[in-house]
Amino acid sequence: MTEADMLFSVTVPGSTANLGPGFDSVGMALSRYLRLSVFPHDEWRFEAETEVVAGIPEGTDNLIYQVAKRTAAHFGKELPPSLVKVWSDIPLARGLGSSAAAIAAAVELANELADLKLSDREKLHFASLEEGHPDNAGASLFGGLVIGLHEEDETEMVSMKDIDLDVVVVIPFYEVLTKDARDVLPESLSYPKAVEASAVSNMLVAGLMAKDWKLVGRMMQKDLFHQPYRRALVPELSKVEHEAGQNGAFGTALSGAGPTILSFIEKGKGEALRNQLASKFPHCEVDCLYVPDTGIIVERKSVNSV
């Protein structure tokens, strides 16, 4: 198959979620990407094009196919068999939204192949049904910062663009599976603790809306919902908090369920922080990312190229 045979491509940014106390509701797009190149074929087949996705299921047991099939079936449609080439630099099970990017891409795949004509709101709802919450999926679909609530019959979301920050990520080479990260959380919080946790979350959102990054950074490190319980799973967290804070970061938090740790810093200062953290954490990948304003992009083959 050559580029001339391609029907369309779908490019989706990765994401981070929570930012500390914005648990299961706050998400932000990040400049790591998943790209699907879709070709007509006589059967469903998925081909990995990068090491990150090497070993993914190659047939109809692939997550992308399963989500696309369920999305199309909701409208009584079937999907024509396709060859899907999968390129990605979003590491799996690291808290950078790899599954949400795949789910968002799958919803768009169904939308294109079955001509569903889904609205943005419908895409968000179907992706959130698969994910269980809208933070990562919303960020991948729409870019920028998103704050949302997902319920079985409806998904609400507010989004904001122009997030003028550098985001430095420290990515350990071990995985933290979402199930394991959920298992360490308490079944409940006491009423006073829940009130305090909610207040911290409210202040995080207020800071985000005002783009008061110093306030945001302080609230990121005051979370009471999940980070106190997950520290044992990510021993680097406390050390990165200290090192990043000593080098100008506004604040540091787990990215999603971890193990990736992210730090916010003033635009233009991220590379210096990246270099500093890379020297301190040689056993991790360290990168300086940005927050793209654009979410999912579909590029269709031009009629003129036929």
Curated annotation (Swiss-Prot):
**Does the entry feature the keyword Hydrolase, yes or no?**
no
Q: In the Enzyme Commission scheme, what number(s) does this protein have?
A: 2.7.1.39
Q: Does the keyword ATP-binding apply?
A: yes
The enzyme class is transferase
Catalysed reactions, as listed in the record: L-homoserine + ATP = O-phospho-L-homoserine + ADP + H(+)
Top-rank taxon, per record:
Bacteria
- Positions contributing to ATP binding: P91, L92, A93, R94, G95, L96, G97, S98, S99, A100, A101
What residue intervals traverse the membrane?
A: none
Q: Name one GO cellular component term.
A: cytoplasm
Against InterPro entries, the record matches this protein to:
GHMP_kinase_C_dom, GHMP_kinase_C_sf, GHMP_kinase_N_dom, GHMP_knse_ATP-bd_CS, Homoserine_kinase, Ribosomal_Su5_D2-typ_SF, Ribsml_uS5_D2-typ_fold_subgr
Give the matching SUPFAM superfamilies. GHMP Kinase, C-terminal domain, Ribosomal protein S5 domain 2-like
One annotated GO molecular function: ATP binding
Q: In which pathway does it act?
A: Amino-acid biosynthesis; L-threonine biosynthesis; L-threonine from L-aspartate: step 4/5
**Annotated keywords:** Amino-acid biosynthesis, ATP-binding, Cytoplasm, Kinase, Nucleotide-binding, Threonine biosynthesis, Transferase
One biological process GO term for this chain? threonine biosynthetic process
Read off the PROSITE patterns from this record: GHMP_KINASES_ATP
Annotated compartments? Cytoplasm
| Pfam families in the cross-refs | GHMP_kinases_C, GHMP_kinases_N
UniProt family annotation: Belongs to the GHMP kinase family. Homoserine kinase subfamily.
> What is this protein's function?
Catalyzes the ATP-dependent phosphorylation of L-homoserine to L-homoserine phosphate.
Q: What is this protein called?
A: Homoserine kinase
Q: Which organism is it from?
A: Bacillus licheniformis (strain ATCC 14580 / DSM 13 / JCM 2505 / CCUG 7422 / NBRC 12200 / NCIMB 9375 / NCTC 10341 / NRRL NRS-1264 / Gibson 46)
The gene behind this protein is thrB
